[in-house]
Amino acid sequence: MDFVVLWVDGNDPEFIREKNKYTPHNRKIDNDEDNVHRYRDYGTFNYWFRMVERHAPWVNNIYLITNGQRPKWLNVNHPKLKWVRHEEFIPKEYLPIFNASAIEMNIHRIDGLSENFVLFNDDMYLIQDVKYSDFFVNEKPKLLAIYEALVPWSRFSKIYFNDVLVLYRHFPNKKALRQSPFKFFNIKYGQLMLKNRLHNFHGGFTHYRNYRAKIGRHIWFFEGNFLFTSGTKCFQFI
């Protein structure tokens, strides 16, 4: 199993110039789409690798995904590190890209990536020891059955709303809940279980994401037009 992590240095002058060149000027950019916090770097990313080394030394490879940037302290010769630039796996018609959703929907295209992998953002840190079975059981992703009420009141929440619409086109609403109710209403979730009591349109609870690469391929097969439209947006607003 591999780990995949996305990183960008929003303070890099070259990155700022490139981003400004492609920022639309014919409409107002929503703060959810483009703000300094979306591309922020607090100078703590090296601790992400230290936490992996400490809490998951068994991981196969770590794929660091960037637009070509790399931290100055990064040891690119480490045997477990695979530094991958956007142009190495994202179709050229999508580039340049400042849309994390478009980057994530192409992760399965990375050469050499294991079938089972876990996707992190650079602000998601391991804080205790983990093992393979924390992420996959019988080669299936181990997920949290916790849902939050979802209302597309902002451009960012519309991303989750669109994701749910796609899922509902292929999977009956609440079928899993009816088949396995105790996976949704389990005392191990503590107070988080209360989220599942809401009856609104539901989106996922935000945490790390464990995937199988073939799922990405299947989604592109069934929803290629939708993903193409999303992927050609430089900024994250669909």
UniProtKB/Swiss-Prot annotation:
It is an enzyme of class 2 (transferase). One of its GO terms (molecular function) is transferase activity, transferring phosphorus-containing groups. GO terms for biological process: polysaccharide biosynthetic process. InterPro entries: Stealth, Stealth_CR1, Stealth_CR2. Signal peptide: none annotated. Pfam families: Stealth_CR1, Stealth_CR2. It comes from the Bacteria. The keyword Transferase applies. Keywords: Exopolysaccharide synthesis, Transferase. Stealth proteins are part of a protein family that is conserved from bacteria to higher eukaryotes. Family members were first identified in microbes as proteins that help pathogens to elude the host innate immune system. Microbial stealth proteins are involved in the biosynthesis of exopolysaccharides. Stealth proteins are predicted to function as hexose-1-phosphoryltransferases. Belongs to the stealth family. PANTHER family: N-ACETYLGLUCOSAMINE-1-PHOSPHOTRANSFERASE SUBUNITS ALPHA_BETA, PTHR24045. This is Capsular polysaccharide phosphotransferase eps5J.
